[in-house]
Design a protein with these regions (language model features):
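N-terminal active-site wall of soluble small-molecule enzyme domains
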Residues: 81-223, 229-234, 260-263
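Catalytic cores of alpha/beta
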Residues: 181-193, 227-239, 269-298
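C-terminal helical cap(s) of enzyme catalytic domains, especially alpha/beta-barrels
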Residues: 257-266, 289, 302-347
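An N-cap/entry alpha-helix motif that binds or orients negatively charged groups
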Residues: 2-120
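Short, well-ordered coil/turn segments that N-cap beta-strands
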Residues: 69-74, 136-138, 170-173, 194-195, ...
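Ligand-binding grooves and catalytic loops that recognize ribose/phosphate and carbohydrate rings
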Residues: 221, 234-242, 248, 257-266
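Glycine-rich phosphate-binding active-site loops on the catalytic face of alpha/beta enzymes
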Residues: 142-144, 188-207, 244-254, 291-312
Length: 347
């Protein structure tokens, strides 16, 4: 049998590591300033969101990406650039582009802008969202961390509006991707019309349970981004039902190919799982599918792809191979089998 995640330990003294530390400090400052502004504005939309809970959490994201045909779903991630710190960690340093400083509250001063590698100008981000939806993605994600990705909460609202569809035929669910440290960020995502919100475990482990509860109370699905066995174990311990298991180590910015697949092995089948982080080929996605993932989140490879529909069709057109997981469940992972190694290289 596959080994379950190790029991979650006490995380009350846990602090964000590496690159995540300054990001968390920045997010806390932003939300602290915003909270001060809203203290005397009880009728502000964000205060009203937090005061009046949603009657239910529809669960549209989970239904959209847990396909019943044995094929992988694709979540298309929209962002204007990739963080400079990630490129630096991977030996990439050219093609820099600077974002404007800003945060959740229009007109508020923000920290100095960072630079990053331009992926797409996204001059009409709503149109780009419709383009991804037409290409066959099952859901969309919009990064709302403007300082690192060049997209913000207004871009999220624009995409939600552009792909809304009708009550009879709703468009794809839209996920707000952010480093969440405060309920106000979740309220902002809900106010913009998001279906779900990502919560980076490495940035908010001691507060993870309360943030997930806030998402549920506001009618959003909470997707926990986890990059270690501890983060996976703790997320499951506090009730997470959707995990984004990424190959990117946010504390260093480095890629760790296969890390998400390794983390997936002990996750129960009833948990919705999303893979991603530096995927470039259909083979990367197929390996995730064979490992049992429900979906893959793709950003740069979609935004810069000249054969978008064909690529999405290639990723989603192959049924998952369950034989690998069967043998893993029997205690054999095939790592010492030359034939298995050759098959892995062909991917």
């Amino acid at each position: 049998m596959a080994n379950p995640p190790a029991p979650a330990r006490n995380v009350s003294r846990w602090t964000p590591e590496g690159l995540l530390g300054p990001i968390v400090d920045e997010k806390r400052l932003e939300t602290e300033l915003l909270e001060g502004d809203l203290a005397h504005r009880p009728d502000h939309p964000l205060n009203l969101r937090l005061a009046f809970y949603a009657p239910s959490t529809p669960g549209r994201l989970g239904r959209a990406i847990r396909r019943g045909d044995g094929r992988l779903a694709v979540i298309g991630a929209l962002k204007r650039f990739t963080p400079a710190a990630y490129d630096d960690a991977r030996g990439l340093s050219d093609g820099r582009w600077s974002s404007a400083a800003g945060n959740m509250d229009d007109g508020r001063r923000g920290p100095p802008p960072q630079t990053g590698r331009l992926l797409s100008s996204l001059d009409d981000i709503g149109r780009d969202g419709r383009r991804l939806a037409a290409a066959g993605v099952s859901a969309l994600a919009v990064h709302v961390d403007e300082r690192r990705y060049g997209t913000d909460i207004s871009d999220l609202a624009a995409v939600v509006k552009a792909v809304a569809g009708t009550s009879a035929e709703p468009g794809p669910p839209v996920v707000a991707a952010d480093v969440v440290v405060h309920p106000l960020q979740i309220a902002a995502a809900a106010e913009a019309g998001a279906t779900a919100v990502t919560i980076v475990a490495g940035a908010a482990l001691p507060d993870l349970e309360s943030l997930l509860n806030t998402a549920t109370l506001l009618g959003l699905e909470g997707v926990v981004e986890a990059a270690s066995d501890l983060e996976v174990a703790y997320a499951l311990d506090v009730g997470a039902t959707a995990l984004y298991l990424t190959d990117v180590d946010r504390s260093t910015g480095r890629l760790r190919p296969g890390a998400g697949v390794a983390l997936r092995r002990g996750v129960p089948e009833w948990v919705t799982t999303i893979a991603g982080g530096g995927f470039t080929t259909a083979g990367d996605a197929w390996a995730a599918a064979d490992a049992g993932f429900d979906a893959v989140m793709l950003g740069e490879v979609l935004l810069r792809n000249r054969r978008l529909e064909g690529y999405v069709a290639e990723v989603t057109g192959r049924e998952r191979d369950v034989s690998r997981r069967f043998f893993e469940a029997m205690g054999y992972d095939g790592r010492d089998d030359p034939a298995a190694k050759a098959g892995a290289r062909r991917l």
